[in-house]
Amino acid sequence: MRGGMGNMQSMMRQMQKMQKKVTEEQEKLNQTEFTGVAPDDMVKVVFTGDHRMKDIVINPEAIDEDDPDMLQDLIVAAVNDAMNRVDSETNKTMGKYTKGIPGM
């Protein structure tokens, strides 16, 4: 009976260590900056790992009064690029902790 409790306590300590590592990795990821760009670098955006926009830079050549849709499309492309980079790095970083856990 005693061996079973010792194993349970050991397992709980391991889970607490892993939870601490996951929290540290998530905090580090949240502070990491990811840059997304539109074609020809006409628009650049910077997001943090927690999906907060920090910066947007628009090349003056991208501003055309007669074609506002072009600028909108460039912004969307840059944001989507940044979000893909955030998601990719998040999956890579956090995936090592969720591998083998059903539903994760």
UniProtKB/Swiss-Prot annotation:
Q: Gene3D superfamilies this protein is in? A: Nucleoid-associated protein YbaB-like domain
| Keyword hit for Nucleotide-binding | no
Q: List the SUPFAM superfamilies.
A: YbaB-like
> Subcellular localization, per the record?
Cytoplasm, Nucleoid
One Gene Ontology term, aspect cellular component: bacterial nucleoid
- Please give the superkingdom of this protein's source: Bacteria
Spans annotated as Disordered:
1-35
Q: Name one Pfam family in it.
A: YbaB_DNA_bd
Q: Where is the composition biased (Low complexity)?
A: 8-17
- Can you name one GO molecular function term for this protein? DNA binding
Q: Which UniProt keywords apply?
A: Cytoplasm, DNA-binding
Indicate yes or no for the key word DNA-binding: yes
Q: Which residues fall in a compositionally biased region of kind Basic and acidic residues?
A: 21-30
Could you tell me what this protein does? Binds to DNA and alters its conformation. May be involved in regulation of gene expression, nucleoid organization and DNA protection.
Do you know which NCBIfam families this protein is assigned to?
Answer: DNA_YbaB_EbfC
Subunit annotation: Homodimer.
* Stated family: Belongs to the YbaB/EbfC family.
- Protein name (database record): Nucleoid-associated protein PEPE_1483
